[in-house]
Amino acid sequence: MTTAKRPLALLILDGWGYRENPHNNAIFHARTPVLDKLNAQFPNSLISGSGLDVGLPDGQMGNSEVGHINIGSGRVVYQELTRVSKAIEEGEFEENTVLCKTIDDAIKANGAVHIMGLLSPGGVHSHEEHIEAMCRMAVKRGAKQVYLHAFLDGRDTPPRSAKGSLAHFGDLFTTLGQGRIASVIGRYYAMDRDNRWDRVSQAYELITQGKGKFSYSNAVDALEAAYSRDENDEFVAASSITDAQGQTASLNDGDSLIFMNFRADRARQITRSVINADFDGFERAVTPKINFVTLTEYAADISAPKAFSSSDLVNTLGETLQNLGKTQLRISETEKYAHVTFFFNGGKEDPFKGEDRIMIPSPKVATYDLQPEMNSTELTDKLVEAIESAKYDVVICNYPNGDMVGHTGNFDAAVKACEAVDACIGRVVAALAKVNGECLITADHGNAEQMTDESTGQAHTAHTSELVPFIYVGRDASIKDGGRLSDIAPTMLSLMGQPVPAEMTGRCIIDLKE
């Protein structure tokens, strides 16, 4: 006979930060009676999810990948942004054997070096300083054909902020005497992660064949034309940039292609379309034989050389629960499924023993402000069912709404998103009460609490560095000050009466009262 579990649930409200200023604060203006009541009745605090507290540079806003790695590992994990930047500063980047080889291979084959990535100072998926270092390195090693395929941001940066980056790289190539920007496209197309292959196919054609919806002789002109079409950076249509002779750049046999994004989730689809022989997401007109390199590891099943190998995280929360013989459930919508699985498990793709996973498809809408509740009702239906089954010791759920709708910059939609999540939390807490379970409610980073950029007046679509909530719905207790995301896993194990592995350098921040 199976013993009924008393589950401990962790609810991660993605993009849900705390900001005292009510101005353009969707969370403040949302009607959230459930969270208001929980904050009034149960121990709660604010914890850090950004900067040095999550292994990022001081002041750098947090993000979903970083947040989930820190939560799941129970330690501060120094992130790829910091790691690559340090390698550049100390001269190790130019000596990276994987990068050197792929440049040299292209030169020997009389081929071109293509560099693609999110051209942005946002620091969430990439950093333009890394891309600049790569361009300089390619020219320094003797590449005569260097092409930059620029994915534009407008999501982790202001919606119309790419002009400075494009102008800078135009000047950079002039100074270097080699290379140019070969294409421009919004991340909406090139960095999809929801199997919208019709989007990715446009980026693929642009990079491999130089075929875009539009063609210009200058990248800044391409951007300004996009703005005149009312396309913000994120949504800039595929635009090829021609050389002085009016020629576009294409990806040919013998060329090298270096992907400079360090974050995996939005890099996987375009990568698979380029390198997988059995790819069937869309019809590929050409499949050139190239040297393809990723900056970091994107997935275990992506067989491409990587410039920076992942550090192995052992005794994460998932692995520890496995070793204790505990059962666990990971559940979210498509948009955040990788975060509660791959990233939460420290970059491990396969589930641990006793770990079940449920993915609820995110709604097929162009942007999530069109359906701010997303599929939170269906997600909660499955979550409540799992809790009431008394099958799991630990349940980990991510509600994507605050982040995904916050990124649209639509204030009214973000308010509705927060209200939808609040209603779902009420159902989850009620289900836990039926089985004598407990709950921790937190967030991975901020977003929806600031919907307008105070300095520019533009929509604020990026994350923030605000503190995030931490609520314990359970026994009589108090919460210590100064918590951070890496304290959550040790706290969960302590609440379960289990030892905390030595590798978890976070601390338990809940003191249970006798």
Curated annotation (Swiss-Prot):
Molecular functions (GO terms): manganese ion binding; phosphoglycerate mutase activity
Binding site for substrate: H125, R155, D156, R187, R193, R263, A264, D265, R266, K336
Protein's organism: Shewanella denitrificans (strain OS217 / ATCC BAA-1090 / DSM 15013)
GO cellular component: cytosol
Positions bound to Mn(2+) 1: D403, H407, H463
Active-site residues (renumbered): S64
Cofactor mode of binding and number, as noted: Binds 2 manganese ions per subunit.
Function: Catalyzes the interconversion of 2-phosphoglycerate and 3-phosphoglycerate.
Statement: the UniProt record of this protein carries the keyword Metal-binding: yes
Listed GO biological process terms: glucose catabolic process; glycolytic process
Name this polypeptide is given: 2,3-bisphosphoglycerate-independent phosphoglycerate mutase
Gene field: gpmI
Recorded catalytic activity of this chain's protein: (2R)-2-phosphoglycerate = (2R)-3-phosphoglycerate
E.C. code: 5.4.2.12
Pathway annotation: Carbohydrate degradation; glycolysis; pyruvate from D-glyceraldehyde 3-phosphate: step 3/5
Subunit: Monomer.
UniProt-annotated binding residues for Mn(2+) 2: D14, S64, D444, H445
Class of this enzyme: isomerase
HAMAP family: GpmI
